[in-house]
Amino acid sequence: MQVTRIIPDVPSFLASMMTFDTWSILFMVVQSLVIFLVVVIVAAMMIIYERRMLALWQDRYGPNRVGPFGSLQLVADMLKIFFKEDWTPNFTDKFMFTLAPAVAMFTALASFAIIPISPTLGVADWDIGILFFFAMAGIAVYAVLFGGWASANKFSLLGGLRSAAQTISYEVFLGLSLMGVVALTGSFNLRAIVEAQADGWYIIPQFFGFLTFVVAGVAVTHRHPFDQPEAEQELAEGYHVEYSGMKFGMFFIGEYVNVVLISALMTCLFFGGWLAPFNLDIPFIPPAFWFMIKTLFFMTMFILARGSLMRPRYDQVMNFGWKVCLPVTLINLLVTAAVILIFSPTL
């Protein structure tokens, strides 16, 4: 008597499932996870890089106790924050208190999906890339606001409100500053913007847009001198004063991920992304090398600003944005539109 086989042959079933499209999806998922992991590692290493550079510029020793020349300080810091007590105060809104650092970390990493590291290396090639970045930046505002409100602490709440006002304001200038680049390229796709700079980087025709983008980028990432939401002398660490352990670590790493993100955007929008300077053709240097060198340069500029500039008052920060950055970006956009209309009316 012949028995009908109900359970299919597993190897053949899996083989039938592994089509070209399936392999493409798996490759994209693995590549995305690797890129996100590398971004987190780079952001963590930037913390030690910042401490060493600040020590060099201030003529003092940096971290030098763990490992040869302090090389294992990052490992020590990670172990310390991992084993710290992740304490949630009783008077907090526990759901919002836990959600805030997760949102901060997620939006920072998700924004990296649009960054083209080389012609073939990147998570997503979207025509709405820049719009996606602004969507994530808008959601990130809620992370700080949730953290400040849920902590039930007056310093946290003031820091959260400062952050919301500052970030929303400077995101306006951030968007207007790169609209000139979008107008010249005719696309929101970052890969298309990089490829359009093959004949010349946009730093020259969009110099004033770049200056405003730098200022707004520092303000949006809450870095010194625009670190008003967490001003230690005024707000006792601001919106994350009640956080500890891994929750604080997610806020902390998220801030440095945002620094890497803004540095990468400066590279792609104004400095040709992976393109070599002066159209140099050096076969043994991969395109990703030029991208990383440019991004590292801007990350160093963030650190230099922290070590050399004073923190202005909160009202001065807001006045500078609305009374200086906004007029500059509008004039830059109007001039760019006029030049395009006169010299490239069919663009």
Curated annotation (Swiss-Prot):
Spans traversing the lipid bilayer: 25-45, 95-115, 128-148, 168-188, 200-220, 251-271, 284-304, 324-344
Record keywords: Cell inner membrane, Cell membrane, Membrane, NAD, Quinone, Translocase, Transmembrane, Transmembrane helix, Ubiquinone
GO cellular component, one term: plasma membrane
GO BP terms: aerobic respiration
EC code(s) of this entry: 7.1.1.-
Matches recorded under InterPro entries: NADH_UbQ_OxRdtase_su1/FPO, NADH_UbQ_OxRdtase_su1_CS
Any GO MF annotation of the entry: quinone binding
Catalytic activity field: a quinone + NADH + 5 H(+)(in) = a quinol + NAD(+) + 4 H(+)(out)
Subcellular location(s) per record: Cell inner membrane
Membrane disposition: Multi-pass membrane protein
UniProt xrefs under Pfam families: NADHdh (PF00146)
SUBUNIT field: NDH-1 is composed of 14 different subunits. Subunits NuoA, H, J, K, L, M, N constitute the membrane sector of the complex.
HAMAP family, per database record: NDH1_NuoH
The protein's role, per its UniProt record: NDH-1 shuttles electrons from NADH, via FMN and iron-sulfur (Fe-S) centers, to quinones in the respiratory chain. The immediate electron acceptor for the enzyme in this species is believed to be ubiquinone. Couples the redox reaction to proton translocation (for every two electrons transferred, four hydrogen ions are translocated across the cytoplasmic membrane), and thus conserves the redox energy in a proton gradient. This subunit may bind ubiquinone.
Membership in a protein family: Belongs to the complex I subunit 1 family.
Protein's name in the database: NADH-quinone oxidoreductase subunit H
Organism: Psychrobacter arcticus (strain DSM 17307 / VKM B-2377 / 273-4)
Biological classification of the source: Bacteria, Pseudomonadati, Pseudomonadota, Gammaproteobacteria, Moraxellales
Gene coding for it: nuoH
